[in-house]
Every structure is written in structure tokens, then in C-alpha cells.
């Protein structure tokens, strides 16, 4: 066992002495040492109860013949960090989480790992760190929260609350109506109830085979979710000494492909593209945006969940058959699902989905009745996004799939929010928010506040938005993000001027600004990208090392 390096031989007597101080005895030194990477934090609704799941996991590991060692990672709640400088820390936290997993696991030479994440950047951060360590690993998330309901039974979620702010600003909601939404949108613990970033990533972990069936859709704080935690912990002990289940053997190129198939079939958060680019690099099987667009062109969009369809939430998809049913339906298009991929349970993907059934064909549609013959995410290219940009097509109104508008430019999210609230944005505008990329922000803030304002103010079918920042999984509308190169590295988005005509064409996979090459060259001659002092040692280091969105916003190591 790997842990023999800290517990075997006379020269490890000091190490054993320290371990005995934690409660270990002679018999424990013959057992596998299992790490539990928890992400309990009180301020995040999807994480405040994870301490109990960690306790359950430790109990099960002991019963199964292992020795558990629980440690914690940090976490950021993107919803609470939204719309202020705190959002600059969200994406960078992914790297800190990955580094912390690598540090604890390798410093102590633990044999296997149970990861208990749930929200936002915590899932990909744990997966990236675990891939570096490459020991047998099982993921089990905290689970999605229930949908909320208004007094008349209308289902709502966190996105309802964000969009309600725009409606209140327009006088379309009273303070009492806004208060009801505020109090009912998030009725329980768990990751926010739609196909937002957290649930998208937990679904993708299930599709990759690094988590047990049900991981993406079983509700938080239920007996069924607790049973998943118990099974995951036991499984980690069972596979601790089995080389076949090293994480890179599970999360390989086929598994990553399957994750992107489910992502396209369910119209996941656009953040998944950013994270899967980064995860694939840690797995040694790097994806490119071109690879992702190729997958998108072959996968039908068969399930719509909030925010794309406001009445459907993760609990509904679970009742309809969950991720196995989505994969099984997608697999009817021969060869699109890599059914031979091994999962952490020891089954192949094909075996896992063989008996899956769709209980509601309106929630998980057959291929013949798909929402679209292509995936719910798309990668766009053009002179405004030479290296690519990402759009969640699942959330775009049909009338906005091809749209040309006059640019109205803002050099920060704060400026954009003030401009939208102040009435500067009119029908026919193409809002440009720049200097919000990984380097420029720094931290690549999510633009949920401005996009929710646009929707809430009734501009969703007459205004589009483009940014080198990113979006919450709750964003809907004609919103294009991840523009690369970003403004801070000299991208064309930094050269756009008010009034320039910008076109998004989803079918053509194009994002262009109607300005000649000669004029762009003239503008570039006098262009100096803006530089912000983030006022933070960590963010300053991050801005120096981070790559652009087309490369997953991973940190470069060549300068170190």
C-alpha cells in the first residue's frame, strides 16, 4: 500500500508515534488509509450539512476495514459572491482547492480518496487535485436542493430571485412579491435546484463514472443521499489497493467524452466547458474547444432543466430516470456514448445504463422528439473570438439564435450593471462587458447580475450580451462568454467601440464584429490593454499565471 511509506519499518517509528497520538493502534497499521476530502462550510447552502456526511463516511470506512482521515477544503458560494468584488475569488478558488487536495494526499501518502464536494468550483477543484494524486477515488456530492414554490404552487429557484431584482427595478413586482420569492427560492440545503454549475458538474461526475449512479440527481438531506455516501465510502475501501481504479484509469478520454455527451444532452452550464478543459489536462487527455464543438454537433439536446425550462428541476429529472436514462437515450445514436468505459463501481458505462428507463418522455425526450438535433452548448468562432467563445444554446430564445445589434461597451461588470439599471441599454443593443476575463478581472467573474437584469427588465428578446468573463449556470438568453483572447491580453473584444455591429449566429457557430481587418489594425496601433491592480497578493499572482478561457483558465507553470 502507498501508505506503507509512512507506517512500515523501524525507521517509521516516529511517524507511527504521531499517528498513535490521533488514536491509531497496532491493527490500524495493516489497513488502508483513506482520505476524505470534505468541503463543509457554514455559509454555503449545499455544504453546511456536509460535516455529517463526513462523519457517516468515516464510520463506513472503519466498518469496511479502512482507517479514515478527514480533511477540509475551502469553498466559495458563487450566488453570495455574485455582483461584487467577491466574485473575483470564485474561479481562483478552484486552483486552491486542487492544490490543497494534492498537498494533503501526497504529504501523507494516503491510499484512496473519498471526495465530498457539491457546489460551483469545489467539484472541479477536487477533481483536478484528485487527478494529480491518481489514487482510487470515489466522488459523492452533497446533492441538489428542492425547488421552491410560490403560494400558488409555481416552482421557483435562485434564478427566479435574481431575475426578480430586474422586475422590481422596473416596478413589475411589489416589495411583498419580491420578499416571497426571496423566502421561497431556496427552501432547503443542497446545490441550487436547476441545471446550474454545481448540479451540472455533479451530473458530469456521474457520467464520467467517478461517482455512483444517482450522484447528480438524488436530493440532498434525504435517506437516499445518505445511502449514497455510505456506499461511496465502502467502495473506496474496496478499491484502495486495486490499480484498475486509479482515478486516471476511470477519468480517461472516454469518460471525459461521456461527460460532454451528457452535458450537451442536458444543456449544462457553460462553466462546464471551462472546467472540463482544465480537468482533461489534469487527466492527461486534453480537450480543445474544437473537440467540444465536434461532440456538440453529434448529440441531441433531450432534457431541459431550469433555467432553460423554469418549471423543471433536478428532482424532476431524477424521477424521470436521471443520468442513466439520459445516457441510454443518447446511446441510441450509435457510437456516441463510449459504453466500454469503466466506472468506479466496476461496471462499464454500458452495463450501468443497460436497464435504465425513461419514466417521463417529456422530461427526458426520445431522440425523435429532441429539443434540438445538436447539443445545448455551442462553441463560437469569428473575428471577435479567434480562439473561441461559449454560449448555452439551451437557454436562447429562438428569435435570438441569430441576432445583430449595436455594441454598447462597458469595461467592467459594475459599469454594466449601472448602465443597465440606469436605462442606457435599449432594444437592439449588443452589450459588451470586457476586462472581466481570467487575467483582466482578474478572476473571470460571473455575469449573472447583468444578464438577470436584462431578462427581468423584459429585454431578453431584443438585447444580446458578450463578455470575456463567464456566466452562472443560472444565466439564460443570448449571452456569449469565455471570449478568447480576452481584452487584457489584446483580444479584439478590447477594440470594439460603441455602435459597432456585432452578430451572433448560433447555427453558423459564428461571433463577429462588422469591422474591417484594416480598421481593427488601425485601432490596435493605438491600443493599450487596461491593467487593474487587484489589491491582493493572491489575485495578483493569479493574474500573472492564469491562461485564457480557451485553455480552461489553468495556471501556467513555465514562469515558476
From Swiss-Prot:
The keyword Transport does not apply. Pathway: Amino-acid biosynthesis; L-isoleucine biosynthesis; L-isoleucine from 2-oxobutanoate: step 3/4; Amino-acid biosynthesis; L-valine biosynthesis; L-valine from pyruvate: step 3/4. GO terms for biological process: isoleucine biosynthetic process; L-valine biosynthetic process. It catalyses: (2R)-2,3-dihydroxy-3-methylbutanoate = 3-methyl-2-oxobutanoate + H2O; (2R,3R)-2,3-dihydroxy-3-methylpentanoate = (S)-3-methyl-2-oxopentanoate + H2O. It is an enzyme of class 4 (lyase). InterPro entries: Dihydro-acid_dehy_C, DihydroxyA_deHydtase, DiOHA_6PGluconate_deHydtase_CS, ILV_EDD_C, ILV_EDD_N, IlvD/EDD_N. It comes from the Bacteria. The modification N6-carboxylysine is found at residue 121. It holds the Pfam family ILVD_EDD_N. PROSITE patterns: ILVD_EDD_1, ILVD_EDD_2. Functions in the biosynthesis of branched-chain amino acids. Catalyzes the dehydration of (2R,3R)-2,3-dihydroxy-3-methylpentanoate (2,3-dihydroxy-3-methylvalerate) into 2-oxo-3-methylpentanoate (2-oxo-3-methylvalerate) and of (2R)-2,3-dihydroxy-3-methylbutanoate (2,3-dihydroxyisovalerate) into 2-oxo-3-methylbutanoate (2-oxoisovalerate), the penultimate precursor to L-isoleucine and L-valine, respectively. This is Dihydroxy-acid dehydratase. It comes from Anaeromyxobacter dehalogenans (strain 2CP-1 / ATCC BAA-258). The lineage of its organism: Bacteria, Pseudomonadati, Myxococcota, Myxococcia, Myxococcales.
Amino acid at each position: 500500500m502507498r501508505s506503507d511509506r509512512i507506517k512500515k519499518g523501524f525507521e517509521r517509528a516516529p511517524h507511527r508515534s504521531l499517528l498513535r497520538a490521533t488514536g491509531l493502534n497496532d491493527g490500524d497499521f495493516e489497513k488502508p488509509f483513506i482520505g476524505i476530502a470534505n468541503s463543509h462550510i457554514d455559509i454555503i447552502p449545499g455544504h453546511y450539512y456536509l460535516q455529517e456526511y463526513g462523519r457517516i463516511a468515516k464510520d463506513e470506512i472503519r466498518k469496511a476495514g479502512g482507517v479514515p482521515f478527514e480533511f477540509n477544503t475551502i469553498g466559495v458560494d458563487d450566488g453570495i459572491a455574485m455582483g461584487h468584488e467577491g466574485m473575483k475569488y470564485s474561479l481562483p478558488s478552484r486552483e486552491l482547492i486542487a492544490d490543497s487536495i494534492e498537498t494533503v494526499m501526497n504529504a501523507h501518502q494516503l491510499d484512496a480518496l473519498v471526495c465530498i464536494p457539491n457546489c460551483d468550483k469545489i467539484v472541479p477543484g477536487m477533481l483536478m487535485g484528485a487527478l494529480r494524486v491518481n489514487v482510487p477515488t470515489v466522488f459523492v456530492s452533497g446533492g441538489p436542493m428542492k425547488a421552491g414554490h410560490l403560494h400558488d404552487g409555481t416552482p421557483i429557484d435562485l434564478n427566479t430571485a435574481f431575475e426578480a431584482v430586474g422586475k422590481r427595478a422596473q416596478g413589475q413586482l411589489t416589495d411583498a412579491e419580491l420578499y416571497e420569492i426571496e423566502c421561497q427560492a431556496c427552501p432547503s440545503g443542497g446545490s441550487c435546484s436547476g441545471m446550474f454549475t454545481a448540479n451540472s458538474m455533479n451530473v458530469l461526475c456521474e457520467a464520467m463514472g467517478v461517482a455512483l449512479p444517482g450522484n447528480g440527481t438524488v436530493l440532498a438531506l434525504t435517506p437516499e443521499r445518505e445511502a449514497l455516501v455510505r456506499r461511496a465510502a465502502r467502495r473506496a475501501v474496496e478499491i484502495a489497493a486495486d490499480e484498475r481504479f486509479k482515478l486516471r484509469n476511470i477519468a480517461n478520454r472516454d469518460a471525459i467524452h461521456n461527460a460532454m455527451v451528457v452535458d450537451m444532452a442536458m444543456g449544462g452550464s457553460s462553466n462546464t466547458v471551462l472546467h472540463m478543459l482544465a480537468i482533461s489536462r489534469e487527466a492527461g487527455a486534453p480537450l480543445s474547444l474544437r473537440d467540444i464543438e465536434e461532440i456538440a454537433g453529434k448529440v441531441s439536446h433531450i432534457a431541459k432543466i431550469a433555467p432553460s425550462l423554469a418549471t423543471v428541476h433536478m428532482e424532476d429529472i431524477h424521477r424521470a430516470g436521471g443520468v442513466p436514462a439520459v445516457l441510454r437515450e443518447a446511446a441510441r445514436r450509435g457510437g456516441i456514448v463510449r459504453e466500454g468505459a469503466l466506472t468506479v463501481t466496476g461496471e462499464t458505462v454500458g452495463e450501468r445504463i443497460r436497464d435504465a428507463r425513461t419514466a417521463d418522455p417529456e422530461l427526458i425526450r426520445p431522440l425523435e422528439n429532441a429539443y434540438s438535433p445538436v447539443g445545448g452548448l455551442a462553441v463560437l468562432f469569428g473575428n471577435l473570438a479567434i480562439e473561441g467563445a461559449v454560449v448555452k444554446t439551451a437557454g436562447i430564445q429562438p428569435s435570438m439564435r441569430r441576432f445583430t445589434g449595436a455594441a454598447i461597451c462597458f469595461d467592467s461588470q459594475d459599469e454594466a450593471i449601472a448602465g443597465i439599471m440606469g436605462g442606457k441599454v435599449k432594444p437592439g443593443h449588443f452589450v459588451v462587458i470586457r476586462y472581466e476575463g481570467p487575467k483582466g478581472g482578474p478572476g473571470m467573474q460571473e455575469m449573472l447580475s447583468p444578464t438577470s437584469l436584462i431578462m427581468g427588465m423584459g429585454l431578453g428578446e431584443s438585447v444580446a450580451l458578450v463578455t470575456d468573463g463567464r456566466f452562472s449556470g443560472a444565466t439564460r438568453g443570448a449571452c456569449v462568454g469565455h471570449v478568447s483572447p480576452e481584452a487584457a491580453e489584446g483580444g479584439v473584444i478590447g477594440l470594439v467601440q460603441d455602435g459597432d455591429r456585432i452578430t451572433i449566429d448560433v447555427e453558423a457557430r459564428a461571433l463577429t464584429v462588422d469591422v474591417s481587418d484594416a480598421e481593427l489594425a488601425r485601432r490596435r496601433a493605438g491600443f493599450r490593454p487596461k491593467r487593474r491592480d487587484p489589491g491582493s497578493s493572491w489575485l495578483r499572482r493569479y493574474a500573472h499565471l492564469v491562461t485564457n478561457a480557451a485553455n480552461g483558465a489553468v495556471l501556467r507553470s513555465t514562469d515558476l
